[in-house]
Amino acid sequence: MPTYILATRLSPEAMAKKFEPYEEEGLSWLDLVKQKCPDVKFLEHYTILGPWDFLDIFEAPNEEVAAKVSMITSSCGASRAESWTAIPYRRFMEIMRELG
């Protein structure tokens, strides 16, 4: 399956909440993604420093399913969510060799 990267920034409203509900909200987000996109397989989930708050690496059957993950994320308190296609480095090198 293709690999995608989801970068998420929380909304100011979500950041203004107390810290306790974050884990519960994160799990409800994950449950909703699993319910609506059962073919998605999450590989990694990171909290990051910088312009984004979270970075997820996941596999999905196609870009439409990856877009659904972004839309669900936006509906669950993210002020911004972007999904990017990721090509594994070894595959990228194969593509380069094909170009000769």
What does each model-identified segment do?
Residues I5-R9, Y46-V69:
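Short, well-ordered beta-strand segments in beta-rich or mixed alpha/beta enzyme
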Residues M1-P38, A86, R90-G100:
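Short S/T/G/P-rich N-terminal loop/turn motif that feeds into the first structured element of a domain
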Residues A60-R90:
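An amphipathic, aromatic/His-enriched active-site/gating alpha helix that lines ligand/cofactor pockets
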Residues P2, K41-E44, S79:
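Short, functionally important structural connectors and interaction interfaces within domains
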Residues L30-F54:
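Short, glycine- and small/hydrophobic-rich beta-strand elements in well-ordered beta-sheets
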